[in-house]
């Protein structure tokens, strides 16, 4: 990655989950390629999250972007984080996704103008999520199937994501039937492209606002690359009290209109379009 001619940033969304966020930040301390900036998009967390972020400030290039808690406003805080960011290339992820040591390096490796990257995650049950400590992240033991099985992880085909073989990962990226969509927990693209589509649609709440952002990138002519087996993060378990049938139905209708109309700029994004 010595020849990289662009800066890279990581945007991490968070809300009142300092214990999970701490594990994630341990992961970013341990990257083979260090990000030039980390922007925390904080949807109104309490003071314990601020204190945690400040404790990492001397070790990581962190910016804390916060607004008052007014319910689930992830799209709005992501737009504020976009404005606060300065890196050419941005990786978007969440407070519950611990990155493997080569996570940033992998996104940089596959970055290409005219494309965004679609990563995935390996979901952990709550008991193992709670067990993971700093040494497990630093040593990369937490990404070892042998260690995870010893902690009680059930074997499944999804475990192939953690095999760590680059050739196999590339093969699986090519044959997976999963579409290369914009996934809020693990996706990356050029900052200028995010501004060209006016960021995230602030009319949307939980459920699909990331996909709709990606669908407008497609409308713009941006293509996607599948890296779900190469850019690995561990997804820590959590509840979703903000998930409602009404918001999901509303968001599906917005996404359907985005695909049908071919719009690129959301009217309710970084700038408000009349």
Model-derived features: where do they sit?
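Short, acidic, metal-binding catalytic loop of nucleotide-sugar glycosyltransferases
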Residues: 26-35
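A conserved acidic beta->alpha catalytic loop
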Residues: 42-51, 97
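Acidic donor-binding loop at a coil-to-helix junction in glycosyltransferase catalytic cores
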Residues: 185, 206-213
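Conserved donor NDP-sugar-binding/catalytic core segment of glycosyltransferases
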Residues: 102-151
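Cell-envelope/extracellular polymer assembly enzymes that use nucleotide-activated donors
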Residues: 6-9, 37, 212
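Glycine-rich, basic loop-to-helix element that forms the pyrophosphate-binding segment
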Residues: 68-85, 102
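Short aromatic/hydrophobic "clamp" motif used to bind/position activated sugar donors
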Residues: 90
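Short beta-strand/loop segment that forms part of the nucleotide-sugar
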Residues: 35-44, 65-67
């Amino acid at each position: 990655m010595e020849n990289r001619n662009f800066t890279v940033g990581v945007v991490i969304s968070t809300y009142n989950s300092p214990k999970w966020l701490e594990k994630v930040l341990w992961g970013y301390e341990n990257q083979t390629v260090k990000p030039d900036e980390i922007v925390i998009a904080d949807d109104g967390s309490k003071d314990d999250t601020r204190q945690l972020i400040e404790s990492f400030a001397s070790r990581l290039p962190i910016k804390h972007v916060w607004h008052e808690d007014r319910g689930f406003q992830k799209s709005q805080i992501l737009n504020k984080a976009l404005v606060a960011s300065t890196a050419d290339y941005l990786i978007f992820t969440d407070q519950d996704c611990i990155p493997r040591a080569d996570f940033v390096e992998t996104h940089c490796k596959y970055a290409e103008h005219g494309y965004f990257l679609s990563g995935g995650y390996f979901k952990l049950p709550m008991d193992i999520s709670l067990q993971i400590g700093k040494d497990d992240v630093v040593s990369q033991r937490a990404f070892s199937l042998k260690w995870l099985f010893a902690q009680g992880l059930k074997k499944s085909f999804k475990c192939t994501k953690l095999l760590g073989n680059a050739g196999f990962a590339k093969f699986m990226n090519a044959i997976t039937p999963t579409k290369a969509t914009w996934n809020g927990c693990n996706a990356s693209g050029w900052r200028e492209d995010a501004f060209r589509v006016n960021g995230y649609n602030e009319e949307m709440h939980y459920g699909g606002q990331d996909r709709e952002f990606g669908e407008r990138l497609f409308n713009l002519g941006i293509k996607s690359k599948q890296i779900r087996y190469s850019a690995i993060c561990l997804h820590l378990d959590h509840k979703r009290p903000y998930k409602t049938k009404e918001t999901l139905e509303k968001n599906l209708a917005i996404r359907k209109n985005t695909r049908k109309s071919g719009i690129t700029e959301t009217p309710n994004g970084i700038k408000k379009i009349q």
